[in-house]
Amino acid sequence: MLKQTLLYTGKAKSVYETDSADHLILVFRDDASAFNGEKIEQLDRKGKVNNRFNAFIMEKLAEAGIETHFEKLLTPNEVLVKKLNMIPVECVIRNYAAGSLCRRLGVEEGKQLTPPTFELFFKDDALGDPMVNESQAIALGWATADQLEKMKELTYQVNDVLKALFDAGNMILVDFKLEFGVFHDRIVLGDEFSPDGCRLWDKDTKKKLDKDRFRQGLGGVVEAYEEVAARLGINLDDI
């Protein structure tokens, strides 16, 4: 598969066309960003670690019957994916209160949410990715009611699979975001799943093992990602 024109440069990944109309190549970069791009740094090895981590998670989800855009790893920081028509809405599941939920509702960080909450956010950096509801997403043409229902169903399925996976590594899956797109009329999981887009805490100490280490200036960001990978049995020796 040949990498061709650069289509898009995001906060942490670059997207390239290929010689296949149905495929793209994603390049995971070492960029770390927070607060809608207000804080940006380069973290050595981050791109390679996230690429390998994402591949592992996507394969686990596929084994559970959840279709993803992941096809195969190409290089330590490149991956071949299906070309989706992305839906501009993020799906967020929260198993415990953290981040913006605490700020919005005055909830103490760490409060278990039973059942887990489901939220939608409009992907727009200029607007700060505002929270939206299903009727707004439908009325504004971002997604159909059927698509949103499928996205919600798949997000809860992902939560069930990954809560068990991280629990086996003595970690709490606090919350996470997912993005979906359409591929030949099917709703398919896109983007990535890595510690950049979820919150993970050690079950015993509540040590943060995700991008909050970067947001909050705690340091040891990539080292925390590597610790998560090690607990899941992800081999990073060759990158």
Curated annotation (Swiss-Prot):
It catalyses: 5-amino-1-(5-phospho-D-ribosyl)imidazole-4-carboxylate + L-aspartate + ATP = (2S)-2-[5-amino-1-(5-phospho-beta-D-ribosyl)imidazole-4-carboxamido]succinate + ADP + phosphate + 2 H(+). InterPro entries: SAICAR_synt/ADE2_N, SAICAR_synt_PurC, SAICAR_synth, SAICAR_synthetase, SAICAR_synthetase_CS. Its EC number is 6.3.2.6. Keywords: ATP-binding, Ligase, Nucleotide-binding, Purine biosynthesis. Pathway: Purine metabolism; IMP biosynthesis via de novo pathway; 5-amino-1-(5-phospho-D-ribosyl)imidazole-4-carboxamide from 5-amino-1-(5-phospho-D-ribosyl)imidazole-4-carboxylate: step 1/2. Belongs to the SAICAR synthetase family. This is Phosphoribosylaminoimidazole-succinocarboxamide synthase.
